[in-house]
Amino acid sequence: TGGFFNFWPTSLWDAAQYMYQQDYVAKDAQGNGQIAVSGHSMGGFSSEMALYLDETNYASTGYRIIRAGLSMGADYSWTSYLGLDEATAVATFGGRTVGKVCGQYDEFFFAADEPPTKSGTVYRKNYVATTAGKTLLEQENPQANTWYTCADGGQRIIYQPNEIHPWNHFSTASTKDAIEFYATAFSDQSGLHQSDLVLERDL
């Protein structure tokens, strides 16, 4: 596990800091970055850690680098070893737009209230109904695929597509969820003139 914990805890946070320094990355009037982080499985853990580390950094800098985060196929089971569980995550979301894609038949995660013996088996899970899901959405009876405005002013959602862990990479359901998430998170950025866009050029 030594190599495992050497990579993902800071990888997306490192990337976000690098991107923030680029002059083509938008910042608001207060210097907050208009950056979103997302990742699947281990990348999802890294996304969760990036939000946490960004909020820790905000305490000393006064600005946030990351505006939104969407993890896919990842809960807080591994980040908890680094002190980041659901309650800590909620306390450090800092008003950001935060979402999770939690496949109902994920083989590895989202069985928060189930006995450990069920880990690694394929059966239907309803993450929003678990203690963890309720904590993240700050609701007593949350529903999947539903936006909630939480105590810090940020919006949160848990998507629960009817799929297994690896499908989060490429399924039409997860792709739709990701597009919908970012359209919501950056809704105030719509209507940009084409001269304000930086596009890749085909060579």
Predicted regions: what they are:
Residues 1-199:
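Soluble extramembrane regions of membrane proteins in the secretory/endomembrane system
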